[in-house]
């Protein structure tokens, strides 16, 4: 019983850490302003992402990692 409880706590801690890291990565990418979608892919690639498009005058970067 104690082992399964410990494993559950470790799993939840890992998931929280991953969620926080993804949120920070998204916040960095969201700071890129744009006017049209053609200007986003190069800016997103410079951030380490594979693609991006302009949404609400901010670049939305995809496949970051």
From Swiss-Prot:
Major localization listed first in the record, in broad terms: secreted
Removed propeptide positions: 22-28
Endpoints of the signal sequence: 1-21
Subcellular location, record wording: Secreted
Site (Basic residue of the functional dyad): 53
Tissue: Expressed by the venom gland.
Site features described as Aromatic residue of the functional dyad, chain residue numbers: 62
Keywords from the UniProt entry: Amidation, Disulfide bond, Ion channel impairing toxin, Potassium channel impairing toxin, Secreted, Signal, Toxin, Voltage-gated potassium channel impairing toxin
Residue(s) carrying Cysteine amide: 64
Disulfide bond residue pairs: 34-54, 40-59, 44-61, 49-64
InterPro entries registered for this protein in UniProt: Scorpion_toxin-like_sf, Scorpion_toxinS_K_inh
GO molecular function: ion channel inhibitor activity; potassium channel regulator activity; toxin activity
Transmembrane segments: none
GO cellular component: extracellular region
Record's comment describing the protein's domains: Has the CSalpha/beta fold, which comprises one or two short alpha helices connected to anti-parallel beta-sheets stabilized by three or four disulfide bonds. Has the structural arrangement of an alpha-helix connected to antiparallel beta-sheets by disulfide bonds (CS-alpha/beta).
Family: Belongs to the short scorpion toxin superfamily. Potassium channel inhibitor family. Alpha-KTx 23 subfamily.
Biological role stated in the UniProt entry: Voltage-gated potassium channel inhibitor. Selectively and reversibly binds (Kd=0.77 nM) and blocks hKv1.3/KCNA3 potassium channels of human T-lymphocytes. Also shows a very weak effect on hKv1.2/KCNA2 (Kd=7.1 uM). Also reduces the fraction of CD40L expressing T cells that are stimulated by alphaCD3/alphaCD28.
Additional free-text comment from the UniProt record: Negative results: has very weak or no effect on many potassium channels (hKCa1.1/KCNMA1, hKCa3.1/KCNN4/IK/SK4, hKv1.1/KCNA1, hKv1.4/KCNA4, hKv1.5/KCNA5, rKv2.1/KCNB1, and hKv11.1/KCNH2/ERG1), and on the tested sodium channel (hNav1.5/SCN5A).
Protein name: Toxin VmKTx1
UniProt organism field: Vaejovis mexicanus smithi
Native organism taxonomy: Eukaryota, Metazoa, Ecdysozoa, Arthropoda, Chelicerata
């Amino acid at each position: 019983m104690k082992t399964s409880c410990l494993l559950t706590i470790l799993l939840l801690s890992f998931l929280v850490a991953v969620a926080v890291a993804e949120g920070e990565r998204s916040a960095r990418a969201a700071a890129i302003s744009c006017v049209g979608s053609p200007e986003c892919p190069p800016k997103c690639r410079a951030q380490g992402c594979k693609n991006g498009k302009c949404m609400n005058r901010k670049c939305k970067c995809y496949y970051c990692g």
